[in-house]
Amino acid sequence: MRKKIAILSLHLGYGGVEKAIISLANSLAKLGKYDIEIVSIYKLYEKSVFDIDEKVKVTYLLSSKLSPNRKEWSEALHNLKLISLGKESLKSLKILYRRRKSMINYIKNTDANVIISTRVFLNELLSEYGSDNTLKIGWEHNHYHDDMKYATDVIRSIKKLDYFVLVSKG
C-alpha cells in the first residue's frame, strides 16, 4: 500500500507559499510512490492559479461561499457603517470557527501517513490534533524580519511536530 502525504494550505491563490505547495505536490506525485493530497481551507478561485498534476488530489474544506471577508469588514469599519460592521464581524467569526473546525476534523480523521503544515496556526492544529502514528512536518516560508513575537509564535507552534523545515535563512 502506498503512503499518503497531505499538505495543509490556507488557500491555493496567488503567492509564493501556494506556488511552493503545488510544486512540492507535483514533484512528489511525479515520483509515483505516494498518494498526494493538498488540503486547502479556502477555495478562492474556480481553478488553481498554478498548474496541479492530475495525480494530486485537492480537497477544499470550506465552500467557496465561505471565504475571508477582511476587505468588507475593513470598509464597514472605515466608513463607520455599524450595522454592516456587526454583520461582517459575525460573518468573520463564523468563517474563522468553520476554518478551525474543518481543519481539526481533517487532521483527526485523515489516513495520511505524513502531514506537512504550512502556517503557524496549522502547525498548532497539527501539533494538538495529529495522530502519534502520523509523521508531522512544519514548513515555514516566512522570514521573521526581526519580529520576535512571530519567531516565538513559530517556535511555540512546532513543539509537538516531528520535523521543521525553514525555506529562508534565518
Features from the language model and the residues they span:
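Extreme N-terminal starter segment of soluble prokaryotic enzymes
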Residues: 2-6
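N-terminal strand-loop element at the rim of the active site
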Residues: 7-14, 27, 31-90
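An amphipathic, basic-hydrophobic alpha-helix
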Residues: 74-114, 152
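Short His-centered aromatic/hydrophobic patch
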Residues: 96, 117-122
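A short, active-site helix/loop in glycosyltransferases that binds the activated sugar's phosphate group
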Residues: 125-126, 162-170
